[in-house]
Regions:
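A generic structural signal for short coil/turn motifs at secondary-structure boundaries
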Residues: 26-27, 217, 244
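Extended, H/D-rich, highly charged conserved domains that either
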Residues: 56-89, 135-240, 250
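Gly/serine-rich nucleotide phosphate-binding loop at the start of the catalytic core
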Residues: 1-155, 162-164
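Short, basic, glycine/proline-bearing loop/turn elements
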Residues: 111-116, 179-180, 241-244
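A Trp-anchored, charged/polar loop motif used as the substrate-binding/catalytic surface
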Residues: 1, 122-129, 181-192, 243-260
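Glycine-rich anion-binding loop/nest that anchors nucleotide
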Residues: 16-22, 148, 207-209, 231-267
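Residue-level marker of regulatory loop/turn positions in helix-turn-helix DNA-binding domains and
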Residues: 7, 197, 247
């Protein structure tokens, strides 16, 4: 019955998908929230069942901000939230350094796991995009929304010649502008006498929480860059306040696009 419902849903005029952190786990081996805690807090991460040993810096910060591991557990989102709240009422160079170091770790862990990754590990991503990006001409493009920072979907699309419209310009430097979501790609005949037909394999990608390759300048411009710094990377780091951060640009625009997509009939 579930399969029948899903198949009928795919026949609708508008198809919208929402991808969370689970799509980057499994075979591709992206970092989980626990992995981020392990690498931000412990001096001996990835040591299997051995007892974890927090770094001296982490122990000092946890003690200073009053974070209770027994109550809130080993939760990097809760820890960084407590750090942010603490810094709102008291200046602490030690806590600031820990937050900066943690952001650098998160940025690296969400980027590095794809370096040299075997193409077969993205097989599920490739199959998903291949099937949903090739739709009937009369149907709208598939819209994929994700809260992930990583580039799994970008890599999977690139490996099979799919085109993603992600709100960035098509020239260098690639800058973010929401109007690019309104663009489409068509195949024009060589004579130019006929109206073009929509190109197959095109979909929209909306990264609600930003991306590891988005860099925001002091003027507010957002560009695609290979290695942005933790301070300039345009993404919402794990924290309970991420919902409030979603109401600043460009995240507000992306959330608005998501809500608008949900209101479309036949979706």
């Amino acid at each position: 019955e579930l399969k029948a419902v899903l198949l009928s849903s795919l026949q609708m005029q508008h198809v919208v998908a929402l991808a969370g952190s689970g799509t980057s786990l499994g075979e591709i081996n992206g970092p989980s929230m626990w992995t981020l805690w392990d690498h931000c807090v412990n001096s001996n991460p990835d040591t299997g069942k051995d007892e974890r040993k927090p770094t001296e810096q982490a122990k000092a910060v946890i003690a200073e901000i009053g974070y209770e591991t027994a109550v809130e557990h080993e939760n990097i989102e809760a820890l960084l939230s407590r750090c942010d709240a603490y810094l709102q009422i008291k200046k602490s160079e030690q806590v600031e350094k820990f937050v900066s170091a943690s952001k650098a770790v998160i940025l690296k862990k969400c980027s590095a796991f794809l370096d040299g990754a075997d193409d077969s590990k993205l097989a599920s991503h490739r199959t998903f995009l291949h099937r949903l990006s090739r739709r009937r001409v009369r149907d709208s493009r598939m819209k994929l929304f994700t809260t992930n920072y990583d580039l799994c979907f970008e890599h999977a699309a690139g490996k099979q010649g799919l085109v993603l419209l992600d709100g960035f310009s098509f020239t260098q430097p690639r800058q973010f502008d929401p109007r690019f979501f309104l663009y489409d790609i068509v195949r024009r005949p060589s004579t130019g006498d006929e109206v073009g037909n929509p190109l197959e394999g095109v979909f929209h990608l909306y990264k609600l929480h930003g991306s590891v390759n988005w860099d925001q300048s002091s003027s507010g411009d957002i560009e695609i860059k290979t290695d942005p710094t933790p301070a300039t990377a345009c993404l919402i780091y794990p924290a309970k306040g991420k919902y409030q951060q979603s109401y600043v640009q460009p995240h507000l625009e992306l959330i608005s696009q998501y809500l608008a997509a949900l209101r479309e009939p036949n979706t």
